[in-house]
Swiss-Prot record:
InterPro entries the record matches: Rotavirus_NSP4 (IPR002107)
Source organism per UniProt: Rotavirus A (isolate RVA/Mouse/United States/Eb/1982/G16P10[16])
Record protein name field: Non-structural glycoprotein 4
Domain notes: Binds 1 calcium ion per tetramer.
Pfam families reported in the protein's UniProt record: Rota_NSP4
Record PTM text: The N-glycosyl content is primarily Man(9)GlcNAc, with a small amount of Man(8)GlcNAc.
Binding site for Ca(2+): 120, 123
Gene Ontology molecular function, alphabetical: channel activity; metal ion binding; toxin activity
A Gene Ontology biological process term: symbiont-mediated activation of host autophagy
Membership in a protein family: Belongs to the rotavirus NSP4 family.
Residues in compartment: Cytoplasmic: 52-175
Length: 175
């Protein structure tokens, strides 16, 4: 017990392990040793972490299949990521969720496109009406049916020769 607490002894053990690993790695056949060790470490950790989850899943019959499937998919995805692959596995529920999300987004985009198209059509019609109103037409083409009757009003020449309505006139009211 005293040897375990001794710092020099601990450093000696660590030095011995490092020297052993360096001697092993110098051999040409052991180039892949660190990769193998890291993969085995991950597998051991996943094994230790997944066993309690599997035991719990087996006790509950209702969700055991889903939990086991989820654990297996997670394990495979972890191994794929450790291997450097960007692909991953999905279960059926996850795929259906993604499909539903994509369909929902497509419906929203279609309604937005429909609204925008309706607005654009209305704007084009409004621009056409404005353009039609701005076009210079000949006198024969102008529809005078909506114009007021100009004959009842005095012209500018009549105003010059006649008395102005602005002149003060005396108004006598009967008492």
């Amino acid at each position: 017990m005293e040897k375990l607490a001794d710092l020099n002894y601990t450093l000696g053990v660590i030095t011995l392990l490092n020297d052993t690993l360096h001697n092993i790695l110098e051999e040409p056949g052991m180039v892949y040793f660190p990769y193998i060790v890291s993969a085995l470490t991950v597998l051991f950790t996943m094994h230790k972490a997944s066993l309690p989850a599997m035991k719990l899943a087996m006790r509950t019959f209702q969700c055991s299949y889903r939990i086991i499937k989820r654990v297996v998919v997670t394990l495979i995805n972890t191994l794929l990521r450790l291997g450097g692959y960007n692909d991953y596995l999905t279960d059926k529920d996850e795929t259906e969720k993604q499909i539903n999300r994509v369909v929902k987004e497509l419906r929203q985009q279609l309604t937005m496109i429909e609204k925008l198209t309706t607005r654009e059509i209305e704007q084009v019609e409004l621009l056409k009406r404005i353009y039609d109103m701005m076009i210079v037409r000949h006198d024969s083409e102008i529809d005078m049916s909506k114009e007021t009757n100009q004959k009842a009003f005095k012209t500018l020449h009549d105003w010059k020769n006649d008395r102005s309505y602005d002149d003060n006139t005396e108004v006598i009211a009967p008492l």
